[in-house]
Structures are given as C-alpha cells and as structure tokens.
Amino acid sequence: MNTQYEMLTYERKVTGAERFFSHAPFSTVTMVARIKSDVTAEMLQNAVDKVQQRHALLRVRIKDTQDGELWFTSQGVQEIPVEVVPRKTENDWIEVHAEGSKAAYDFEARPAIRFILVQDTDESELIILCHHMICDGMSLAYLARDLMVHLGDPQADVQV
C-alpha cells in the first residue's frame, strides 16, 4: 500500500470488550458475495489496498506488550493477503468458508481479516472473514460495499 496514510502512525489500547473477543474461539464476522464477472487476484488486491485507505482498522496489527497489554498499532503491518481458490461447482464456497473460518489470525503481523476469492471466469464468490475485534456486521457490510465499488471501477477515488 503506497499512500499518504502509511505515514500516519496509529496506536490505541485494545478495550476490554475487544480483548474479550481476542480470546473467543468463534469471533469471526463473515460476508460472502457472489460476483457475476471475471475477477482476478490482481483486481481484488488493488480493491483491498484501496479500502484500507478508508477503513483505519485494516491498517493495524495487534501488539502484545511486556506487561500483557494489547495495542492496535499501524507500525510494521504486513500486507493483507488475497487467497484465490479455483471454483469447480457453485457450492465450493461453502467448504472454502468452513475451512477459512477455522484458520487462526496472525494478529501480531497483519490486520485480522482474510479475503478468499473462489474464482471462475463467469462467476465467483468473495469470502470476507474478519475478526470481531476490528469489525461488526454493519462495518463489514460497508467494507464490502466499498470493495465492490473499487472492483467495479478500479480508477474510482477513495472516499475518506
């Protein structure tokens, strides 16, 4: 991500409720969108990079201090990976979602979100798995909306 937002440092202590969610085994908020178009990994990565500019918690990782405090920080954050899985049947996304839901988040390295594209040339499913520490259902709906805007119009300006 090469933007002016990289320059700004963001840090705040994780709240008690957020800390509770960090230890909850099933704290993933999920959205699945069926896209009736050809979406490439490059197109999706570009859209993810753009939505990171608008959604601050997509630019943070969680660091654990010596005294056991958890903090959100924008320093040393790795890129959000986009996973692509070939789509063979229209129900493949169900199994991919189930497997993706079991995978642990790498809180110390990158934002607690995953994007999985179950890809075909005519129709694909985009699975977004986000830890409840950085999103809820409504914020994930807004994020998905913004992602679709940038998938549909890669040249669209980012509204901050």
PLM segments and residue spans:
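N-terminal beta-alpha "docking/capping" segments at the starts of catalytic domains
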Residues: M1-A41, N46
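Short, exposed beta-strand "edge-strand" segments with a Pro/Gly-rich flavor and a Y/T-containing core
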Residues: D38, V82-V85, V160
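Acyl-thioester-dependent condensation/acyltransferase catalytic cores
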Residues: Q45-M138, Y142-R145, V149-G152
